[in-house]
Amino acid sequence: MTPKKFKKICKKYFTDPAFTMEDISSVADGSITISIFYYGYGVLRYCLDEDREKSFLLIADKFRYSEKYGKILPCRNDGSFIGIWNDYTKLYNVGHNSLIKIILSLIEKIKIAKVEYKKQLLEKDFENEG
């Protein structure tokens, strides 16, 4: 999968100018991921690899220890917690309801864009064979 083509499809679903996307490649395993920012805050990283379809990760400015949860969690520059992920699929609110809703709606939009992208790939493969 090429991030540039996927990003182009995503733009149809990301109509709010507050959102920006940036392509990055994970050095650790070579998988391609797209980072999504909301007003400059990194809020979501989505992995394009088939075997990691549910790899949604919260990106934070920094991390700090939460006494309430007994673990290190992502937070903003002012120290307020953004949220925590459980099994990469459920986001638990720690205090930023509107941001949580935005992130969850982003995930749905990305899923729609990914289905469209896969459809285009299949159509292209079919044309190449014919």
Description of each model-found segment:
Residues 1, 119-130:
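Short intrinsically disordered terminal tails
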Residues 3-16, 75-120:
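Ampiphathic alpha-helical segments that act as solvent-exposed interaction surfaces
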